[in-house]
Amino acid sequence: AACLFGCQQQDNLQDPSKEAIDFSISIDNQSITDLLTRNSAALSLPVKNSFSTGDVISMSVSNQDYLPFALGVDSQTWDEIDTDVESVTFYAHYPELTDEAATRALGKRYRSIKGGKEHLFGIAQAIRGTKNVALKFKRMTVPVILLDEDGRPYNGKASIKLRLRNRGIQDLFNGKVELDKSAEAEDINIKKVSDGELTNLIPQETIKAGEVIGEVSIEGEKQKIVANQDVEVSAGNAIVMRFARNRVIFDGHTPLRR
């Protein structure tokens, strides 16, 4: 974790409640690290694995409305926090909330969320007056990574579509994304690493063996992708589709037939 975020006014040194809180920000990258270990440690992925000055999150304190917070630019003091409780919980979303969810408090704590983009959620607990607050983020969606049979980013001519449900409901105050049961299956274009961002899926029920879950198109020919065994689609756990000779390997170890 890098401690970037907090500045301090000399005039306020005598009153701790007026000093800016130092926020240290970290992202749980264990699932990505495990993936690279299984496939290629030299693989560089376009995922958010650290924060930089100027990144904007949405932050809520003690279930109050979410407000934009530019890391390393904005500051927060205990004096500005409207709560009398001793143990305070901070909640944060990245990217920032840009719809009506940004102004919803605990009474309306859910929002609809569309698949495709990467979503992270962070939480921290601190005793009121504490100088340092450590926000720890986790991935709430499921990144999909296309590799070739040698474990390198796939840059061939094939295009891949998965046919899954792609809309969820997110709890704004624990970050969890659940599948919207009313959502219909739709075609989801899976981006390549070279596109500069990964396609992220909504967490959903286990894909059952035998299900047709998409298709590969190459030079006008289309072939179905059928799961040979049950496959989990769970938050934070990246899915790898590796193109090997005459087959596709799903998640680094689960074979699919085309």
Task: Give names to the regions the model predicted.
Residues 5-258:
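Sec-type signal peptide cleavage vicinity
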Residues 1-3:
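Bacterial N-terminal signal peptides
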